[in-house]
Design a protein with these regions (language model features):
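Positions that flank functional sites
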Residues: 86, 112-113, 284-285
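Auxiliary Fe-S-binding modules of radical SAM enzymes
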Residues: 1-23, 190-298
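Conserved AdoMet/S-adenosylmethionine-binding subsite of the radical SAM
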Residues: 92-251
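Flexible, glycine- and charge-enriched loops at secondary-structure boundaries
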Residues: 83, 87, 170, 174, ...
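Glycine-rich active-site/cofactor-binding loop and its immediate structural neighborhood
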Residues: 62, 67-100, 106
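N-terminal [4Fe-4S]-dependent radical SAM core
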Residues: 1-65, 69, 73-78, 292-296
Length: 298
């Protein structure tokens, strides 16, 4: 690939040249072609069907095509903290995690390194591979990952496109993400859970409740209820928002979600027709659950 069109921004930047020239033009992700990883370790704080009893083999990539103002992983997603590695090293990391007992390999924010991901998964792994994404994906990229990804873990951050532009620089986010999610579902079908309660394949749609944005969340749940039947996808309502990154620049989101806000959303969910999924407790809204990006496992 000479010019990059891997994500919906379609920057058209020569990312190989970007990293070789001090005056190179950076795309939205701010990265070259070689993967940059900030942490690779067993992670116990994903959904129970992902973390299981031994942990999810989570690989945190640096850089991102969204740069959400409130990102909890801001130092790696926006400041690109991490270590550049080869595709061969990336493959080694997968097997290092599997040897540690990982139930799966969990690729966090890997979209801009799709070429490296495809190269690293030429041979199938003995555990499921999870693609942990913002949801801001192209149909073409999803198609290219067919048979390499068993579990799609997209966010559906916004039903409100103005909010998507304001906080994440993601124009047309809702249509883009919902089209991507439908494509993911067509690729892997209804979710499958094994005898140990671990997810073997399928789609989990995540949504993070933001302060002062109840309608945004309700419309997300409406879309899921309208487009999927029980038994098809899992929904994960996340209650872990704390102001991070540049959230202080936006007073309306520079606070935690109130108990009243969460209760309204939770009640709406229980009446929505969505039957399969997870709800986080309010104790999840803590900086204690943010990983330390110190190069562990890289």
């Amino acid at each position: 690939m000479t010019y990059c069109y891997v994500c919906p921004h379609r920057c058209g930047v020569d990312r190989a040249e970007t990293m070789n020239s001090p005056n190179g033009i950076f795309g939205s992700c701010g990265c070259g072609m070689q993967p940059i990883v900030a942490r690779a370790a067993l992670h116990m704080w994903e959904e129970p069907c992902i973390s299981g009893t031994k942990g999810s083999g989570t690989v945190f990539f640096s850089g991102c095509n969204l740069h959400c103002a409130f990102c909890q992983n801001y130092e790696i997603s926006c400041l690109n903290k991490g270590q550049e590695i080869s595709v061969e090293r990336l493959k080694e990391i997968y097997f290092d995690l599997i040897k540690q007992g990982a139930h799966n390999i969990n690729l966090v924010t890997a979209t801009h390194f799709t070429e490296a991901i495809i190269a690293s998964l030429q041979e199938p792994l003995p555990v499921p591979v999870i693609y942990n994404t913002s949801g801001f994906e192209t149909v073409d990229t999803i198609h290219r990952l067919k048979n390499k990804i068993q579990i799609w873990l997209p966010d559906l951050k916004y039903s409100d496109d103005l909010a998507a532009i304001k906080y994440s620089n993601a124009p047309n986010y809702f249509n883009t993400a919902t089209t991507a999610i439908k494509t993911m579902y067509k690729q892997v079908g209804p979710y499958q859970i094994d005898e140990n309660g671990l997810l073997k394949s399928g789609v989990i749609i995540r949504h993070l409740l933001l302060p002062n944005m109840l309608e945004n969340t309700l419309r997300v749940m409406d879309w899921i209820a309208d487009n999927f039947e029980p038994g098809q996808v899992l929904f994960s309502l996340m209650h872990q928002y704390i102001p991070c990154g540049r959230a202080a620049e936006y007073p309306e989101i520079n606070r935690v979600v109130t108990a009243e806000e969460y209760q309204k959303v939770e009640q709406y969910l229980f009446n929505s027709g969505i039957e399969d999924g997870f709800v986080q407790e309010d104790t999840a809204a803590s900086a204690d659950f943010i990983p330390i990006f110190d190069g562990t496992g890289v």
